[in-house]
UniProtKB/Swiss-Prot annotation:
Heparin binds at N36. InterPro entries: Fibroblast_GF_fam, IL1/FGF. The record marks K128, R129, K134 as: Important for interaction with integrin. Phosphorylation at Tyr-82 regulates FGF2 unconventional secretion. Pfam families: FGF. A motif (Cell attachment site) lies at residues 46-48, 88-90. This is Fibroblast growth factor 2. Signal peptide: none annotated. Its main location: secreted. Monomer. Homodimer. Interacts with FGFR1, FGFR2, FGFR3 and FGFR4. Affinity between fibroblast growth factors (FGFs) and their receptors is increased by heparan sulfate glycosaminoglycans that function as coreceptors. Interacts with CSPG4, FGFBP1 and TEC. Found in a complex with FGFBP1, FGF1 and FGF2. Interacts with FGFBP3. Interacts with integrin ITGAV:ITGB3; the interaction is required for FGF2 signaling. Interacts with SNORC (via the extracellular domain). Interacts with glypican GPC3. Keywords: Angiogenesis, Developmental protein, Differentiation, Growth factor, Heparin-binding, Isopeptide bond, Mitogen, Nucleus, Phosphoprotein, Secreted, Ubl conjugation.
Length: 155
Protein backbone atom coordinates (compact mmCIF):
# COMPACT_ATOMS: atom_id res chain seq x y z
CA UNK A 1 0.00 0.00 0.00
CA UNK A 2 1.40 3.38 -1.00
CA UNK A 3 1.85 6.10 1.60
CA UNK A 4 -1.22 8.29 1.82
CA UNK A 5 -3.53 5.86 0.00
CA UNK A 6 -6.96 5.06 1.36
CA UNK A 7 -8.47 1.59 1.37
CA UNK A 8 -12.23 1.15 1.54
CA UNK A 9 -14.05 -1.97 2.63
CA UNK A 10 -17.48 -3.00 1.34
CA UNK A 11 -20.36 -2.20 3.69
CA UNK A 12 -22.35 -5.28 2.64
CA UNK A 13 -21.21 -8.63 1.32
CA UNK A 14 -21.71 -9.03 -2.43
CA UNK A 15 -24.33 -11.75 -1.87
CA UNK A 16 -26.58 -9.18 -0.18
CA UNK A 17 -26.40 -10.88 3.25
CA UNK A 18 -26.42 -8.83 6.41
CA UNK A 19 -22.73 -9.36 7.20
CA UNK A 20 -23.45 -8.14 10.74
CA UNK A 21 -20.96 -10.54 12.30
CA UNK A 22 -17.60 -11.72 10.96
CA UNK A 23 -16.93 -15.47 10.63
CA UNK A 24 -16.66 -17.08 14.05
CA UNK A 25 -19.27 -14.87 15.69
CA UNK A 26 -21.00 -15.86 18.93
CA UNK A 27 -23.60 -18.03 17.17
CA UNK A 28 -20.95 -20.59 16.26
CA UNK A 29 -20.27 -23.22 18.95
CA UNK A 30 -17.18 -22.61 21.09
CA UNK A 31 -14.82 -24.54 23.32
CA UNK A 32 -13.68 -22.71 26.46
CA UNK A 33 -10.00 -23.47 27.07
CA UNK A 34 -8.86 -22.82 30.64
CA UNK A 35 -5.37 -21.40 31.16
CA UNK A 36 -5.09 -23.40 34.40
CA UNK A 37 -4.06 -26.91 33.36
CA UNK A 38 -5.14 -26.72 29.73
CA UNK A 39 -8.65 -28.10 30.21
CA UNK A 40 -11.76 -27.46 28.15
CA UNK A 41 -14.93 -26.72 30.13
CA UNK A 42 -17.24 -29.74 29.81
CA UNK A 43 -20.99 -29.96 30.47
CA UNK A 44 -22.29 -33.52 30.95
CA UNK A 45 -25.87 -34.63 30.11
CA UNK A 46 -26.35 -35.65 33.78
CA UNK A 47 -25.66 -32.08 34.97
CA UNK A 48 -22.03 -32.47 36.05
CA UNK A 49 -19.45 -29.85 35.05
CA UNK A 50 -15.70 -30.40 34.83
CA UNK A 51 -12.71 -29.99 32.52
CA UNK A 52 -11.15 -32.38 30.02
CA UNK A 53 -8.06 -32.10 27.83
CA UNK A 54 -9.48 -34.17 24.97
CA UNK A 55 -10.36 -31.77 22.11
CA UNK A 56 -12.69 -34.30 20.47
CA UNK A 57 -14.97 -34.76 23.52
CA UNK A 58 -18.48 -33.87 22.24
CA UNK A 59 -19.48 -32.37 25.60
CA UNK A 60 -17.04 -29.44 25.33
CA UNK A 61 -19.00 -27.89 22.45
CA UNK A 62 -20.71 -24.87 24.00
CA UNK A 63 -23.17 -22.28 22.77
CA UNK A 64 -22.54 -18.81 24.21
CA UNK A 65 -25.64 -16.66 23.92
CA UNK A 66 -25.65 -12.93 24.58
CA UNK A 67 -28.54 -12.18 26.93
CA UNK A 68 -27.83 -8.47 27.38
CA UNK A 69 -24.78 -6.25 27.03
CA UNK A 70 -21.82 -8.08 28.60
CA UNK A 71 -23.97 -10.97 29.92
CA UNK A 72 -24.02 -14.47 28.45
CA UNK A 73 -25.53 -17.86 29.10
CA UNK A 74 -23.43 -20.94 28.32
CA UNK A 75 -25.22 -24.01 26.98
CA UNK A 76 -23.72 -27.45 26.41
CA UNK A 77 -24.74 -28.32 22.85
CA UNK A 78 -24.76 -32.13 23.34
CA UNK A 79 -25.99 -32.05 26.94
CA UNK A 80 -28.71 -29.49 26.13
CA UNK A 81 -28.12 -27.93 29.58
CA UNK A 82 -27.08 -24.50 30.81
CA UNK A 83 -24.07 -23.78 33.00
CA UNK A 84 -25.24 -22.53 36.41
CA UNK A 85 -23.59 -21.43 39.65
CA UNK A 86 -25.46 -22.43 42.79
CA UNK A 87 -25.66 -20.44 46.04
CA UNK A 88 -22.86 -22.54 47.59
CA UNK A 89 -20.57 -21.85 44.62
CA UNK A 90 -20.91 -25.25 42.91
CA UNK A 91 -21.03 -25.38 39.12
CA UNK A 92 -23.64 -27.60 37.55
CA UNK A 93 -25.75 -27.76 34.42
CA UNK A 94 -29.43 -26.90 34.55
CA UNK A 95 -32.10 -28.16 32.12
CA UNK A 96 -33.69 -24.72 32.01
CA UNK A 97 -32.36 -21.17 32.26
CA UNK A 98 -32.55 -19.62 35.73
CA UNK A 99 -31.04 -16.47 37.23
CA UNK A 100 -28.03 -18.63 38.20
CA UNK A 101 -27.23 -19.24 34.49
CA UNK A 102 -26.10 -15.73 33.57
CA UNK A 103 -22.47 -14.63 33.60
CA UNK A 104 -20.68 -11.35 32.98
CA UNK A 105 -18.24 -12.03 30.14
CA UNK A 106 -15.15 -9.84 30.20
CA UNK A 107 -12.13 -9.73 27.92
CA UNK A 108 -9.09 -9.28 30.15
CA UNK A 109 -5.89 -7.43 29.22
CA UNK A 110 -4.15 -10.78 28.56
CA UNK A 111 -6.80 -11.63 25.90
CA UNK A 112 -8.42 -14.35 28.01
CA UNK A 113 -12.08 -14.10 28.99
CA UNK A 114 -13.55 -14.36 32.47
CA UNK A 115 -17.11 -15.42 33.33
CA UNK A 116 -18.37 -13.91 36.58
CA UNK A 117 -21.72 -14.91 38.03
CA UNK A 118 -24.37 -12.21 37.67
CA UNK A 119 -26.26 -13.47 40.73
CA UNK A 120 -23.20 -14.10 42.95
CA UNK A 121 -21.18 -11.20 41.62
CA UNK A 122 -17.79 -11.88 43.22
CA UNK A 123 -17.62 -15.51 42.04
CA UNK A 124 -16.17 -16.77 38.76
CA UNK A 125 -16.42 -19.88 36.61
CA UNK A 126 -13.07 -21.63 37.23
CA UNK A 127 -11.28 -24.94 36.76
CA UNK A 128 -8.61 -26.38 39.07
CA UNK A 129 -5.37 -27.90 37.75
CA UNK A 130 -7.01 -31.32 38.23
CA UNK A 131 -9.88 -30.51 35.85
CA UNK A 132 -12.46 -30.24 38.63
CA UNK A 133 -14.44 -27.02 38.88
CA UNK A 134 -13.41 -24.58 41.59
CA UNK A 135 -16.02 -23.41 44.10
CA UNK A 136 -17.16 -19.83 43.49
CA UNK A 137 -16.13 -18.48 46.93
CA UNK A 138 -12.55 -19.70 46.30
CA UNK A 139 -12.23 -17.74 43.03
CA UNK A 140 -11.06 -14.21 42.49
CA UNK A 141 -9.43 -11.76 40.07
CA UNK A 142 -5.87 -12.61 39.05
CA UNK A 143 -6.25 -16.40 39.32
CA UNK A 144 -5.28 -18.54 36.30
CA UNK A 145 -8.26 -20.79 37.06
CA UNK A 146 -10.76 -18.12 35.94
CA UNK A 147 -9.11 -17.41 32.57
CA UNK A 148 -10.72 -18.96 29.49
CA UNK A 149 -9.88 -18.70 25.82
CA UNK A 150 -12.91 -19.14 23.55
CA UNK A 151 -11.97 -21.35 20.59
CA UNK A 152 -14.02 -22.46 17.61
CA UNK A 153 -15.75 -25.82 18.00
CA UNK A 154 -16.84 -26.22 14.40
CA UNK A 155 -16.49 -29.80 13.21
Amino acid sequence: MAAGSITTLPALPEDGGSGAFPPGHFKDPKRLYCKNGGFFLRIHPDGRVDGVREKSDPHIKLQLQAEERGVVSIKGVCANRYLAMKEDGRLLASKCVTDECFFFERLESNNYNTYRSRKYSSWYVALKRTGQYKLGPKTGPGQKAILFLPMSAKS
